[in-house]
Amino acid sequence: MEDVNQEKKKVPPMSEPERSTPIKTTGGQYRFCKSCVEGSSCRTVRSRTKLMNVLIERGRPHEAQTVFKTLAETGHRPSLISYTTLLAAMTVQKQYGSISSIVSEVEQSGTKLDSIFFNAVINAFSESGNMEDAVQALLKMKELGLNPTTSTYNTLIKGYGIAGKPERSSELLDLMLEEGNVDVGPNIRTFNVLVQAWCKKKKVEEAWEVVKKMEECGVRPDTVTYNTIATCYVQKGETVRAESEVVEKMVMKEKAKPNGRTCGIVVGGYCREGRVRDGLRFVRRMKEMRVEANLVVFNSLINGFVEVMDRDGIDEVLTLMKECNVKADVITYSTVMNAWSSAGYMEKAAQVFKEMVKAGVKPDAHAYSILAKGYVRAKEPKKAEELLETLIVESRPNVVIFTTVISGWCSNGSMDDAMRVFNKMCKFGVSPNIKTFETLMWGYLEVKQPWKAEEVLQMMRGCGVKPENSTFLLLAEAWRVAGLTDESNKAINALKCKDIEIAKLEKLYQKQSSGSSFNLLQIPVGKRELPTAKAMNLSACKLGARVPIICQKQSQAQFGISGQFVHSCTVFLS
């Protein structure tokens, strides 16, 4: 209602300089909006400002900026609400550099400022951590006779927390309490923001002091309050205290009961600490309290049991999911499938894949890549390529699965097949990356055809992919393995980075050459059981720190997957 009243206020008429600058319309005519020139409320400005708010709410703040620009371009003058909304759009996008200029523009226009505008300014500065300018805005606000609200102080408290100064946040709370003004009294958000500020610095005891003061002021801590402190304990590696000190208090509170978020915080903490059994125990405890874990929680448990090679634990989680009527998605299937695949149990992995399709869950490129990678490890590149063909028909394969299949043929020494898949990749419109080219170069190294590796390097440049130091080192090794030392030295000399310790690298090559082969993928050895996270990762190319098949993002995603599992999944673990 306050916004509506603000919009109806008479806007100052355009100044003489503004009047003297005509605006060209799409029809080629020059005009001004009569309402804007006279300082009256303009319907167009109101409607476009409303549109800006809608765009921000829908997560499209950049479009809100564009709408704002069209106001002036079409002969309209933005209102104070327009500028306030623009500030909100800039803040969401973290474009803090223009805040001061926007404030100056509004002040120069002669528009009468209000507390809503100043709150937006203070919020923008606070979000950026620029508390000096945020405080200056507060002082200017008071100079103009505008009273700060509880929201104003909450924003400043949050800002000092962002700036890593919770002590100043506490001082502001004390100031609010000392003033005794009902209009600016602390509320639940005030205290929660301050708790968050202390927890950000991992000062749990200070956070508990805020909770104590909160209760003394007659404000009841809520679930957000306790979840924030629980998160702090988890980040400190003290998940046991999160359960014993935080959750126990929540259980006793009427209006701050544990929820799904609480469950996720504690279970995630136990899993990160390697105490997956405690995580499973906690989920069962929450189930008894009718707080059911969500998909993320269950998948964290599955992933945790995979890392500690506990197949019985995985089975227990899947059974519990069935009891909770939680269904699987592609990520959960991928987690279990990856465990079997990495351990070398390709029949089990393929069975999980079939069950996923049977359950109506559509495999994504990552799921296909996991299975293809397993076949490559098992020296079955033909099956890996069959998966690729299926993916081409049903979806769109990415560079990862193409490179995985190429590496499979390279591992078998079938370079004609590797190049055939490479050409298919290009024909399909998937751009090869440096890992693709280095995989081919490694393949030619294995079959002792360094001149072919040289051709791949030229092809790489032709595709606009810039070679890296590892590329030249790979080429040098290809020539060296073929017994052509002079050509190897030429490749090393082509390195642009002169600070590389060539002697150390050559020593590394000598050590690696003592092995039977230059393996691109690490084949599981020893006991055929669920591997640890490290064992499940593809090994780096032997020439250096490069993972040839899986990009960093996907490699991380393998062990940070979240999701859920179907009722029939337990059969795969028997």
Swiss-Prot record:
Keywords, in A-Z order: Repeat
Compositionally biased tracts (Basic and acidic residues): 1-21
Domain of life of the organism encoding this protein: Eukaryota
UniProt PPR repeat ranges: 44-78, 79-113, 114-148, 149-183, 187-221, 222-258, 259-293, 294-328, 329-363, 364-394, 398-432, 433-467
Stretches the record annotates as Disordered: 1-25
Gene3D superfamilies noted in UniProt: Tetratricopeptide repeat domain (1.25.40.10)
PROSITE patterns: PPR (PS51375)
Pfam families xrefs: PPR, PPR_2
Family to which the UniProt record says this protein belongs: Belongs to the PPR family. P subfamily.
Protein's name according to its UniProt entry: Pentatricopeptide repeat-containing protein At5g25630
